[in-house]
Amino acid sequence: ENISEVDRLLNETDDRYVSLNYDCGHFYFANEDPLKAIKKYMPRISHIHLKDVRDNIKTRVEKENLSFLQGVKLGVFTVPGDGDIENMGEILSYIKKQNYNGWVVVEAEQDSAVANPFEYAKMGYEFINKHMNIW
């Protein structure tokens, strides 16, 4: 999911029928700026996935030429605020400023034996609320 692939998809499809499920973690994993991406694609976004990325695992995936799935299993993704996407707070603020009212899903995609789901859900909630002040 890099910018050129998304550009091609959106340029070659009718916006009445095709929208974008924006995922900040996937853009970052593809070495794209997720803030730049959301600003560019907001008119076509109908669904948002929020997750953060652990750079140490992302670097390992790249150096060892591991698959996306292997990266997920190693714990490359985490809840917003627990990873290394430096402009995550700006992304959240931008979503709020745009008065986006579609679905937002918080993802962690982690091993529940390693990362307690309740604790990580709470951590993600607190970070999101800090930047969006919606609850």
What are these regions (language model features)?
Residues I3-S19, H26-W135:
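Histidine-acidic metal/acid-base catalytic patches
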